[in-house]
Amino acid sequence: LILLMLALMPLCAFAQNGWNDALYKQIEQNVNEPVFKDKTYDVTKYGASPKATAAKNQKAINKAIEECSKKGGGKVVVPAGTYNTGAIRLKSNVNLEIQKDAKLQFVFDKTLYPIVKTRWEGMDCMNYSPCVYAYGEKNIAITGEGTIDGGGSNATWWKWCGKDRFGWTPQLEESQKIGRPLLFKLAEAGTDIEKRDMKDKGLRPQLINLYNCEGIAIKNVTLLNSPFWVIHPLLSKNILVKGVKIWNEGPNGDGCDPESCENVIIDGCTFHTGDDCIAIKSGRNRDGLKWNIPSQNIIIRNCTMEDGHGGVVIGSEISGGVKNVFAENCEMDSPNLDRVLRIKTNTCRGGVTENIYVRNITVGQCGEAVMRINLAYEPNEAAERGHIPTVRNVYMSNVTCKKSKYGVLINGLDDADEIYNIHVDNCTFDGVQDQAVKRTGKSHDIFFNNLVVNGSTVLLDPPYKHYSEWMTHSEMKRAPQSYLLDFAKKPRWSYTIGTELEPMLDTYRAYKDESILNYCKAYPDKMIAADGTITGYKYEDFNLDNCRTGHFLINLYQLYPQPSILKGMKTIFKQLENQPRTKEGVFW
């Protein structure tokens, strides 16, 4: 069995892992951590206090940020203590530092969250300000060893999601059951953003939303209980998210969702979320297609996904496309983790997702599939159809998983073949409970190289219809010269070669592959001279092993009637006629 597997391996559809080192290094060079003036603004000097009301603290913190920015920037410090507050607006050249043992505690009071321009599930709108918000700013940061708590719970923001288990009741007047379909309708109609007012419509704000900003760092803070998505950079560039700890089990509690962003590094973060850990986006349907700005040049590395629906997710709001995403050296393990790499989209979205690289990921378990590509996500979505999405150039390598339902799950479209050039290389998936690979709809050029599922090598599309062809070409690839089939360093007349070439010739007879016949011809052409002399053969040795290869010559002569082959056969037959025998008449 081991020899068989070794023989088959060269025929597996081989693919390099596709990792683009040059682009990876270019992204690293483009993402420079912001630098700030060495000047400190303590929020307590502006009236903030653990004993103050949320409204007073909000005013004080925003005043400190405003003054810091106007004076050329620096560090706005939140010292130890818990500060109730409402929405905070970050300004250019400001580093908001939440120090150790400090907590910004955002309260559930709509009056403290003014209406601002943002996006909600990929649709442009005017909605409640995110807890920390910036628009059109440069050189900004959120740092420190402290905590930002969005105050999400079943008693506050989360009940607006419209689900019983998060506190929603039919008596609740404000929830996304009202706002979400309204925003869908306005977005599909192309309504001006300023007229898409979601006040009192139940659309929860993000914890951090940095819109149209450049030069961003979010480092070392702990982020808890977001009303909605946790970190949401939007239409922004040059972003570093490093050493952040996220704990958010609320509805739609995505950890970090860069949307239509360029040059992003997410490094050394820990995610414990009620939805996707990282979800890359670029706008939904009409809005995303109108802006048509991809998320691109993103590095995800050294992260731990403790809990969440998906580890690295692309979609579903990706109408603007996604490209050049690198994920490496991460650990994932949770019964609630459904997928390691997930790409989800549909024909309302359109867009091209390409150049996705995933390597060196260790997974304890995931609920559904290690890799899931789905072009039929949310099939009942009420939006304009006909925008065919494309997913191509996806490379996964050196990923291990101890338990899942599927290894690879690909759901293409029935009427368009837009999933292709997908590579899974040197991966081991154990404990796969259903199918190693499941495909629906159309897809092509799916390549597996050394994909081992439950201890067995998996090939999606065997390169030959018949095992005999497969084995023959495997050996031809291993030893391009038939006269070296027996692993010798120089040609010799060999029992081993004869016993292997004979079934190869049978394969030619069955399937008429001329390359096999030519391969077989090469041995006698090399070994038998015109006069019938056989290289390496000695009549006087009376070695019966040398005669075994004559079987092959007899069969080959019927297809390749060369005089030299006939003379060679006669030479061997002469030995048989004179071979010493026992008294019973059989050969020694």
Show where each model-derived region lies.
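Sec-dependent signal peptide recognition
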Residues: 1-5
